[in-house]
């Protein structure tokens, strides 16, 4: 309580809620455990390959030796069948968690579903993330089924906004 009050005593600081945190996270392309990464999603599928240290990778000093190492290391070598991608729906309607993603605007096959999505205030439109087949590239079009209608969605690079911080 005392710490929060100290922070809020600065007029440049304002309290925010989970909605603000979530929109910032989405725009930054950061995954949320339980949505974009689960026990059924590997680090390679979640685009988190950087989290596996070089010494634990194939050929590293202490290669493998962690739960799921065989699968994870094979996928890091280029074998992931699906990956987390950014999506930019056309129009203003956000696509949210659970919305089906299809490979065609009519008929076609469901190829995944949105794991996180919402409105991105900094980009001025809806943004989303989904785990989809690995062959998709930025600029490719897929379709989201929203309220019984399929809308075009463009696969996009993440983060949706370019960071302006210094490393």
For the regions a language model picked out, list residue spans one by one:
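Conserved, structured C-terminal
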Residues: 1-167
């Amino acid at each position: 309580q005392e710490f929060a009050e100290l922070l809020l005593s600065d007029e440049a600081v304002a309290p925010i809620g989970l909605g603000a945190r979530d929109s910032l996270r989405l725009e930054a392309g950061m995954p949320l455990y339980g949505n974009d990464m689960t026990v059924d999603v590997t680090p390679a599928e979640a685009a988190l390959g950087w989290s596996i240290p070089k010494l634990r990778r194939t050929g590293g000093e202490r290669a493998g030796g962690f739960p799921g190492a065989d699968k994870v290391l094979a996928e890091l070598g280029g074998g992931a069948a699906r990956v987390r991608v950014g999506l930019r729906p056309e129009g203003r309607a956000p696509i949210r968690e659970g919305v089906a993603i299809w490979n065609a605007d009519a008929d076609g096959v469901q190829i995944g579903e949105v794991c996180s999505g919402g409105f991105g205030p900094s980009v001025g439109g809806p943004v989303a993330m989904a785990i989809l087949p690995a062959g998709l590239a930025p600029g490719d079009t897929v379709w989201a089924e929203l309220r019984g209608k399929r809308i075009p969605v463009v696969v996009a690079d993440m983060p949706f906004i370019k960071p302006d911080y210094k490393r």
